Regions:
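MFS-fold secondary transporters
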Residues: 94-98, 114, 190
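Short hydrophobic/alpha-helical segments at membrane-entry points of transmembrane helices
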Residues: 103-111
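Helix-loop-helix hairpin linking two adjacent transmembrane segments in secondary transporters
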Residues: 144-196
Length: 213
């Protein structure tokens, strides 16, 4: 890690971890707010009242603050790669549960539990700090935070169109299911990566433990 500049166009070693991390963060926000741009269709499907819609929006963020503390503790105990993988895996099935919901109560429960996905950004901060030296960590975390936060905007821009492409009264369900599928893809990619604690991936795929300075 002797280079002083970060090559963002590289897709190997620590830069690959950066790209996986920001996309994982992106997906957490994409899933966390996947219901918001589709709320009109959800309201129509379940004949929701204004109060019920407000409740779904509130429940979606209710767990986030305690979740960030809990996720931080888990990262300290088990490492960021494992925790990110588990969070995305669990959140994908919460997306499926929301998409297949057949009552307001089921919708509300899934949205409440989805508050945990808002803690995803905590994991990446730790992961980036482990993979990048001090002279690069600021830029790396800027890329991580900047692109990751775009997830909620991307959901608002893309999911209504995706729902229309699927068509029919269940288009919104398929659009939300798709966000869960994307999360599973990232989980599979994460599980192929090394733990990364002060590590450098060599060209032959082996991991060399080094001191990050």
């Amino acid at each position: 890690m002797s280079e002083s500049k970060l090559n963002l166009f590289s897709f190997s070693g620590k830069t690959r971890i950066l790209h996986l991390s920001w996309f994982a963060f992106f997906l957490t926000f994409f899933m966390w707010f996947n219901h918001a741009p589709l709320i009109a269709s959800i309201r129509e499907a379940f004949d929701l009242t204004d109060q019920q819609v407000k409740m779904l929006l509130i429940l979606n963020v209710a767990l986030t603050i305690p979740a960030r503390i809990i996720i931080g503790m888990l990262v300290d105990a088990f490492g960021p790669r494992r925790v990110y993988s588990i969070l995305l895996f669990t959140s994908s099935f919460l997306c499926f549960g929301f998409a297949f919901a057949d009552s307001f109560e089921r919708l509300a429960m899934m949205r409440f539990l989805m508050g945990f996905v808002g803690a995803g950004f905590v994991i990446g901060i730790r992961m980036i700090s482990e993979w990048f030296p001090a002279r690069q960590v600021g830029v790396a975390e800027g890329v991580y935070g900047g692109w990751g936060n775009f997830g909620s905007a991307a959901a608002a821009l893309s999911l209504p169109t995706i729902a229309l492409m699927f068509g029919g009264e269940n288009g919104w369900r398929y659009a939300i299911m798709l966000t869960g599928v994307l999360a599973l893809v990232i989980v599979a990619l994460f599980l192929e990566e090394p733990e990364g604690h002060m590590a450098e991936v060599l060209p032959d795929g082996t991991v060399q433990m080094i001191e990050v300075t």
